[in-house]
Amino acid sequence: MAKKPVQFTLNGSEKATFVEEGQNLLDVLRRGVGDLTPKYGCAQGTCGACTVLIDGEPHLSCLTLAETVEGRSVATVAGLENGAALHPLQEAFMRNFAAQCGYCTPGMLMAAKALLERNPRPTREEVVEAISGNICRCTGYEAIIAAILEAAGSGSAASKGRG
Amino acid sequence: MPVHVETHANISDAARALSSARDGRFFGGGTLLMRALNEADQSIGTIVRCTDPVLRQVRSEGDRIAIGAGVTMAEIMANRDLAFLAPVARIIGGPAVRSAATVGGNLFAEPPYGDFTTALLALDASVRFAGESGQSTPLQDFLRDRANRRGRVVESVMVPRITDPKALRFVKVTRVKPKGAALMSIAAWLPGSGGRGCRIAYGNMAPTPVRAAAAERALEGASLSEQGIARALQAATEGLTPPTDMFASEWYRREVAPVHLKRLLLGQGQ
C-alpha cells in the first residue's frame, strides 16, 4: 500500500510522518507519532473518546482522514499539561471526581477546551451540548458538567495548553 | 483491499476522476465514509477528494441560496443567511461531528442519518452537480434515484431564501437524549398563511427522506389549528410504508407520526 508524507503541528511541535491511504488520524497519532492520549473507542464517531482539536475545532480523529491534517494544527490532551502543572480543566476534573475509568476523559477534556476557547462563560445547557457527542459509561455526566463549569468559572481554562 | 485516495484541486477534475474510478466514492466530511473504511468496507476502491473552494461557498442566486456541498454543519450554524437552517444543523451529532459533516454528504446518508436532507426536501431544495451551470435537479428526483448518483460530484444545494425562521419547522424524534439517532424526523415548510403551499417531509420513514403528500394536500387552505390540521393528521402516513428497524417498528412509527406532526404544526414544544 502506498504511503504518503504528512506534516502537521501536534501540540505546538512539528511532526512529519508517513500515512497509509485511507488511514485515520487516530491511528496515526497513536501508532505513527506515539501520542496515546486520544483513545480508540468505537471507530464509528459515536463515543467521542478520540476527540482532538484541529485548528481549534473539535474533530473525531477516528473519522478524520489522516492526510487531511497536512499543514494544520492538531491538539490533544498531551498538550494540556505544562510540566508538572495540570491544565485548569484537568484540575477541575480531579476536584469534581469527573473521571472513574478515565477512558472518556481525553475526549471530554478536548470537547470542553473547544467550548471554552470560543465561549469562556458557558451556561450549563451549552456545556451539555458541547459534550453531547461524548459518551461516559461510569462516572455519569453530572460530575463532568460540574467540572467544566468550575473550570470556566476560574477564567483561565480556555487559553492554557499547547497547540 | 487497499483503498486509493486521490485529491483534486479542481471540481471538474474530481468529477472526471470519480466517474472513471472503479468502486469510487466521493469524500465529503468523512463522518460516514471513514466509518465505512474503519469497518473495512470492501466495496470502496477509490476515494476522491476535492479541495476546490467552490465547494465551501455560500452565495446568493436571486431568491435562492447556493450552499456548497462541502459546507459543514458548523458553518451552517455560523452563517447568518442560513439562520433558518441552524436549528436543523444543531441537532446533528455533537460539535465534533458538525465540524466535519457536510451538506453534500448528508444527501447520501442512509437511515438513521440524513436529517438535514429531510429539511432540504421540505424546502424544495435542488441539487447542482459539478459542471452544471444554471441548472439543477429537484431534490425529490435526486433522492428517487440516489443510489445511481454516487458516481457524480455534487457542487451545491439550492434552497429558497427564508427570512422568517418560523417558516421552517423541524423535529428529530429520538429515544436517547440529548443526542441520538432519529427514529423519525419531520420538517415542515409553511411559506404562506396557514397551511397554504406547505411542504412536509419525513426522515427515516422510508429508505430516503420522503414527502408526506397526503398530509400536505389535507393542509392546503386549512388553518393551523387543532380543527384545521385534523384531516392532515389522519393522513400523516398515508401512502407510506415505514420500516421496522432497531429504532422502532412500523406500527410505532405510524402511531407517533401524527403526534409529532401535530406538535410541529401547532408550534407546541417537543
Q: What residues fall within each predicted segment?
A:
Chain B
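C-terminal structural segment of proteins
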Residues: 1-270
